[in-house]
Every structure is written in C-alpha cells, then in structure tokens.
C-alpha cells in the first residue's frame, strides 16, 4: 500500500471514530452548559427574592464563573479530539479514563461495563496524547462493534521498561441490555486499530480475545 493510500485509509477510520463519538462529545458539552444554565436560573430567582441580602446571589455568580471555566476546559478538550495538538503528552491513566468515558456514552443501554486495572507505574507513564486517545478509543469501539450484546470490558495497564502496555479484552456478560445492540455508523475492527497504530508507530498485537497496544514512554 502506497503511503498516500495508507493516509487516506487512516483518515477514513478517524472520520468513522468521530461519527461514533459524536453523541458522547455532545453530551459532554451539554452537561457543562446545563450546569451554567441551572446556576444562572437559581441566581435569577435569588435576585427576585426581596428577602435576599445579596450574599447568596454573589455566591451563585461565583459558582457560575467556576462552571464557565470548567466548560471552557471541556471545550478545549473536545477541540483536541477534532484537531490533536502536535507533540502533546498525557498519562496512560488519564487517556484511558477519558476514552472509556467517551466511548461508553451509551453503555448503560447496552448493559456494558468496563473494569480498569491501572497500577500507578503504568497509569503515570507519559505517552503521546494524540496516539493514546486515537488508539485507545478506537480499540474500545472496535471491541463493542465486534462483540454485540452486553459486555464486561477489561482494560489493564502494565509498565514494560521504556514502554507501557495496554491490554483490552471483551467478555460476554449475562446482563440483559434495555435495548437491542446496534452498530453506530460503520463497524470497526482490529485491522482498523492496526492501521492507525502503524501511523503512530505504536506496536499492536492480538492474542485470541486479548488486544495489546504498546506505547513508548516519553521523558518527563
């Protein structure tokens, strides 16, 4: 495969991933904005209350400022999903937490749960943010696409010298999902993860039901 063709294929996979994440990204932003709206409405009611001496209203205004700053941070985080910052670094633990939360936006409807085992040495390992986010979230989405029905997803980190491994496995669960499982947009597979991994020079392997991503640990 020519390099240009490989880039086109990788970009096509990235588009599929973003389409799948659209609901989670929207819910993330709406949750932050609804908090601001709620505080603003409470503050307005306090201002209409003649018995209020103004102190509680000032408290609500201060809370709105805090909520707005949190919303700004969330917006920046969402923008990074759309256009990753070149050379940005994150920890494996942080990346896993963000990716599982975002990819698992509809897991309650699928009766799917994730169990994360992240020892401190692995969780604190610094790795490329763009590679980690892209590969972890794509791996999780591929697991749910390839294993319809309720799942128990195991995510395990392990420090391996100058690299850190992330192992993912999906096990069928006996929990009954409230709704029938369905694939959003297009199904992703391990071959899609492997193609993106090659674009980031990340080693990826598969042994039976277990998939492994090996990230290079970056200097602090």
Give residue spans per PLM region.
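Histidine phosphotransfer helical core of two-component systems
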Residues: 2-3, 7-10, 14-17, 21, ...
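The cytosolic transmitter module of two-component sensor histidine kinases
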Residues: 14, 18, 29, 53-57, ...
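Conserved ATP-binding N-box helix of the HATPase_c
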Residues: 19-42, 126-154, 186-200
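Conserved DHp (HisKA) dimerization/phosphotransfer helix of two-component histidine kinases, i.e.
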Residues: 39-42, 56-113
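Hydrophobic coiled-coil of the DHp/HisKA dimerization-phosphotransfer domain
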Residues: 85, 89, 124-129
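Conserved catalytic submotifs in the C-terminal HATPase_c
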Residues: 113-124, 160
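Glycine-rich/acidic phosphate-handling loop/turn and adjacent ATP-lid/helix
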Residues: 159-194, 218
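Glycine-rich ATP-binding loops of the HATPase_c
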Residues: 198-213
């Amino acid at each position: 495969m020519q390099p240009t063709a490989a880039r086109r294929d990788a970009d096509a996979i990235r588009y599929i991933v973003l389409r799948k994440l659209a609901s989670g990204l929207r819910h993330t932003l709406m949750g932050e904005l609804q908090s601001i709206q709620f505080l603003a409405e409470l503050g307005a009611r306090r201002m209409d209350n003649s018995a209020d001496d103004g102190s509680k209203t000032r408290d609500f205004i201060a809370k709105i400022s805090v909520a707005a700053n949190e919303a700004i941070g969330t917006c920046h985080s969402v923008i990074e999903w759309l256009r990753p910052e070149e050379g940005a670094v994150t920890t494996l633990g942080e990346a896993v937490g963000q990716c599982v939360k975002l990819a698992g936006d509809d897991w309650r409807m699928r009766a799917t749960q994730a169990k994360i085992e992240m020892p401190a040495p692995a969780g604190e390992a610094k790795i490329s943010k763009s590679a980690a986010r892209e590969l972890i979230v794509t791996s999780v989405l591929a697991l749910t696409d390839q294993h319809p029905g309720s799942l128990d997803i195991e995510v395990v980190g392990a420090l391996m010298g100058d690299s850190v491994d992330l192992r993912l496995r999906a096990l069928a669960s006996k929990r009954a999902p409230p709704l029938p499982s369905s694939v959003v947009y297009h199904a992703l597979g391990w071959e899609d993860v492997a193609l993106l991994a090659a674009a980031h020079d990340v080693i990826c392997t598969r042994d039976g039901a277990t998939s492994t991503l090996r990230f290079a640990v970056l200097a602090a």
